[in-house]
Amino acid sequence: MDAHSVNLVNNDKPVVVCCGDSITHGHIGYDWVSSLREKDNSKIYINAGVNADLTWNLNQRVDDIIKHNPDYVTILIGTNDAIGSQNIKHIQDYYVETKGLPRLPHIDWYSSELEKFIKTVKFQTHAQIIISTLPWLGEQSDAKIITVVKAHNDVIRSLSEKYNLTLIDLFKHFEDLIDSNDSVPYTTTEWRRLRGLRAVFYIMYLDGAGIELERNID
């Protein structure tokens, strides 16, 4: 059930639109939106996650979200912004070419686009907005990408406070777990093991975030 395929005519259930990228879409990883839908039939859960989207892309389809007149909007977006903001040419070129970006990703652009999306939803709907920090990327706390993710999460926390949003700190769900993994990253057998564990972690921790989300939309 995505943002383009839902018929809400004559349906008085509260509408929850879950906005984001592949983490929300759930096609590759754990589909936490479907899990919420299965656990709670008192609301309509609409999956507005699109694989590989950046926040700019989310703004291009904001009208599809608003038209559902949501009671709740969840936001989990920025992982691709964080990855693309690294000064690595082939990664940046990939996002520009495949996602039709008008410029190279940058944290300042992320902040601007995220605030734009929040303001649009806040002022054009009556929805309660629930925003989440980004999850970890990789398994090592000293990896360069973690510094990038933390900077993007600072943006999320700041905007959450500025606009009085409900914050779910998904990053913290991963933090202790990742810190406890002192194995050598990405060796062949270890990488296979971590791939399997990651699937379990996503089920455990994203489902945990889903439960936390459920509490916030009662």
How would you name each of these model-derived features?
Residues M1-V16:
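Membrane/wall-proximal cationic-aromatic binding patches
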Residues N10-D12, S35-N41, N57-I217:
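Alpha-helical cap/lid subdomain in secreted, periplasmic
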Residues S22-H25, G49-D53, W136-E139:
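Short histidine/acidic/glycine/proline-rich micro-motifs that form metal-
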Residues W32:
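N-terminal carbohydrate-binding/catalytic regions of secreted carbohydrate-active enzymes
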Residues S42-W56:
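A short beta-strand-loop structural module common to alpha/beta enzyme folds
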